[in-house]
Amino acid sequence: MRGNTLGGFDRFRLPAALLVVAIHTGPLLSVSPFANDLLTDIWGRIAVPFFFAVSGWFLVPRLRREGAAALGPFLKKTLLLYLLSALLYLPLNLYNHTLADSGASLLRDIFFNGTFYHLWYFPALALGACIVWALVRGLGRWAWLPAVLLYLVGLLGDSWYGLTAALPPLRAAYEGMFLCFDYTRNGLFSTPIFLLLGGWLAQRPRRNRPGLYGVGLSLSLVLLTAEGLLVKNFDLARFDALYLTLPLCVGFLLLWLAALELPAAPALRGWTAAIYVLHPWCIVLVRGGARVVGLTGLLVDNSLGHYGAVVLLSALLALPFAFYRPAKADPRGRAWIEVDAAALRHNLSALSALLPEGGKLMPVVKAKAYGHGDLEVARICSG
């Protein structure tokens, strides 16, 4: 499917970003704690895996074709965004004395937990991409199997931790793992499966059946809700970010959005990404501003008012990023390539050394040596 018909992905970025803000603000706490749990602890957990799966939709097919050549630029962009976001939250970290922790704790935050509570997304995406690249390179079409096993390991350290805690040897193993990271919701356990899921769906034959996929999404949401309520009823969760039915929901969500064949909306990409990055700062600003103007009751104590204020401020501060476009290459520009004659002579010598006694190379120069100059290259080859 052409990228310009995947506007459904762009449009769902906004609800996904708003769900992330909801997780960190609890918009329905003043109305109904139960409804808030449904929204933030169950349905809201679709948001970040959706972002991972969309990244996988575009990245994994390229990893299969190009290998490390596709991984490098992706890591560079992801880690640059992580660095800039970490610098943005450095003042809050200094205020909270977070950086006063031990070196081991700081490394754990940088590589797994994120340097601020929502920034775990960036190291998780980078680490998950590296794992997926290794799995695709080493196992090909079987790359999904270790990813599923990793997710199950993560699941037993998250929503289904109650089962783990009931088995002392297993609990001891997880307690050892939690010395390295605070949660199994990280790039090692939770990210690879969603990247591969997105990549696998991208390479499937496209079927324009939005109604069918919508039914599948609805049923999978029912299963997710039932699982989440079961986990809460039996108090099984150590943290509630991973569910067994979550990949099913995300898969049907991507299929449904892709089947809608909506035009691309690139402005939403930068805007929603900025909302994601900026909203914790906006939580701090709303709380501080409400105290200054005497509106704490409306903008902090009232959960809906607090959520609305944070969303509005985040959306406004993120608005410039909706208009940002990377600079395009000048169509009038010229490209060139330099041929190292010494390297060509070295390669010819090395190939000649592999030939049996009396054998000779017979170079074929075509298409003007692909723009390098047929006469010049022929002279070197015959020399």
Model-derived features with residue positions:
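Alpha-helical transmembrane segments and their immediate juxtamembrane cytosolic regions
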Residues: M1-R332
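A charged N-terminal "starter" segment
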Residues: D330-G383
